[in-house]
Amino acid sequence: MRGFIIGRFQPFHKGHLEVIKKIAEEVDEIIIGIGSAQKSHTLENPFTAGERILMITQSLKDYDLTYYPIPIKDIEFNSIWVSYVESLTPPFDIVYSGNPLVRVLFEERGYEVKRPEMFNRKEYSGTEIRRRMLNGEKWEHLVPKAVVDVIKEIKGVERLRKLAQTDK
């Protein structure tokens, strides 16, 4: 059985890792949709789709998982979004999402949709991790070591801080 999960993964953190490990107990293969794939270099979406794929693949390389990271651009056309996703991915049997819109769209198309258990959502949040990066607070413990390495390699914290500057 193949499952599908989508997220922005800005950045990929330990909460995402725990959700994927849990899903792997229920399915044989996981399609990991990299949402908002066209977005990067903003405070909300600082990392490119390629950088996020690197974060995910490096974080999962020590786990015995079969997964497919697939970049998925936003199309702003909800009624056909599921068909769009299906056209980009291998077929899947079950969808994992806590997002109400994603849940409704897939349920309306006849998919079984499960709400994954969220892990420490207060700290394991991309918004919180990016806030900590901007403010010079500790964030490294909230992401897998591989993600720390990728963010250092791409100078991700420096990028985020430059993006936060104003022209005043």
From Swiss-Prot:
Disulfide bonds: none
The UniProt record lists the keyword Nucleotide-binding: yes
EC number(s) reported in the record: 2.7.7.1
Organism whose genome encodes this protein: Methanocaldococcus jannaschii (strain ATCC 43067 / DSM 2661 / JAL-1 / JCM 10045 / NBRC 100440) (Methanococcus jannaschii)
Protein name, entry field: Nicotinamide-nucleotide adenylyltransferase
Annotated Gene Ontology cellular component terms: cytoplasm
Catalytic activity: beta-nicotinamide D-ribonucleotide + ATP + H(+) = diphosphate + NAD(+)
Family label: Belongs to the archaeal NMN adenylyltransferase family.
